[in-house]
Amino acid sequence: MPDQMLSSSRSYATKLVAVIVSFNRCEHLKQGVSAVLDEPVSGLVVVDNGSSDGSREWLASLEDSRLRVILPERNLGGAGGFEVGFKKALEAFDPDWLVCFDDDARPAPGALAAFLEQDLEGIDGAAAAVYYPDGSICEMNRPSWNPFWHVRLLCKTVLGTLTGRSRGGFHLADRHYREARVDIDSSSFVGCFVRAEAVRSIGLPRGELFIYGDDIIYTLSLRKSGSRHVFLPSIRFIHDCSADLRGNARIAPLWKAFYAYRNGLVMYRVAAGGWFPFVLPVKLLSWLFAVRHYPEKRRYLHLCWSALRDALRKRPSCSHEELVRRYP
């Protein structure tokens, strides 16, 4: 705590504003908000997506001039939360940089102050090193390169797909967490720093994506705009995720599969560019092979068709509430 208090008392020329999206994880949220407000940030925006666990009441009890709380009337999902959160941060604080993360994540003590001390010349995006509370690397937040932009990585990824190790073809290795900084193409929204001017240039995160892939799509779009995105291993975040879903053959509830499939195609369209027509049939085949894991096969296949249609049309065909009703 003394180190945190020291960093909070220092004055920085660069204005950093944090954005947190929360939903029914009050105890985690308390840790995240406390960690941010102990740092030299110019502002904090919390978007609470309709929590019913006391989060809203706790947020209302806080008194800090740097805090702005947004209480949407309906659940906007992580993507929608970051969209309105980024917008509010830009309007309320006119920052130089934004940093975002979910309510079950938080910056390690001194992380945000350390970011403000970095040489950020020529950089528009940065990813922190994200760890589980036990100190191991958080796999879901491991930054990556886009294999479609790097021939060697594309070959490595294709070979890895044949052996079930495709992630290793384009995600950073453990050794990169011991280096100074690494240029990357994409990263998650846990400990993601974006220059405010870049946000104004490429636009806000796409709220209609709701969940899954919105962070990868956004950071890939940042890179496609010509901006530089780097991994900063010295800036540490902690992600206290409750579950690791790797290896699960079936996505439940079913509506989550819709977002995973549709947004996956949106992501591949951004990542693959001219290669997308070759990637599309491969992804569709993987969906068809997965049908054996779903008891309601007709409903699952209807979901696949809806996800394909929406991805190709580039617009949602129904509301989140309707999706939940169709695919419980």
Where are these regions (language model features)?
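Short, well-formed alpha-helical segments that are part of the catalytic scaffolds
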Residues: R25-D38
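A conserved acidic beta->alpha catalytic loop
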Residues: A35, D48-E57, R74, A105
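Conserved donor nucleotide-binding strand/loop of the catalytic core
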Residues: A60-G80, K88-A92, I123
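Short beta-strand-to-loop acidic/aromatic patch adjacent to the donor-nucleotide binding site
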Residues: D94-D104
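Conserved donor NDP-sugar-binding/catalytic core segment of glycosyltransferases
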Residues: G110-P147
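A recurrent flexible, glycine/aromatic-enriched loop bordering the glycosyltransferase active site
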Residues: R167, D174-V194
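A short, conserved alpha-helix in the catalytic core of glycosyltransferases
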Residues: S186-S187, G191-V194, A198-L204, E208-I235
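Non-catalytic, C-terminal membrane-associated alpha-helical segments of glycosyltransferases
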Residues: W255-A260, G273-P328
